[in-house]
Amino acid sequence: LLLTPQISLMFRTKSAQLDSIYTCHLLYTVRLRKPEQGYREFDGPGRDLMEKALALRIRLDAMIKGKETRDRLIAASGGAIRELLDLVSQSAFAAAGDEIRLSDVERAVGKRKQRMRDLINANGWINELVRLSREKQISSDQKCMDILFHRLAFKYNGEGCYDIHPLVAEIPEFERAVGESQSALSSA
């Protein structure tokens, strides 16, 4: 039996019993870029690994022919297989035929971003997301645990850094809050 609980579950004190009952292995998100790079940039083998994983699930060359389309899906997933498969599924529903085009992906990405935006705004998580995107580490704040639970941030393999979901970076309120945060830091 293989279970994949949210990473935030592993950090809760009441979850300490999980390790004593089950053999737990954490499956981190695949690193697609360096922390200082933009969210649509790639560095290292992560992009190719995600594409290979996707090719094991679908007829990749028939369904998603364009490299730009594949790159957008992979970048928008943030390196999380679950996110990638969900975006591909939603893009396939939007597709007019057998092939998923960039416009289908953008439609699926737009819907996902709107759900994220509503969730972030309804719960007041924007400032914690800005902090997490800057520091690349989690905090003990309950908002941070909620952000992890809702997959608005990921833990990446390698150095063990955290970062926000790349689609969060495209949300207007986040962009505005980052600008305000940078202004406040530079004037301090």
Set out the residue ranges of the language-model regions:
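The catalytic "switch" region of P-loop NTPases
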Residues: 1-67
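C-terminal alpha-helical "lid" subdomain
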Residues: 60-188
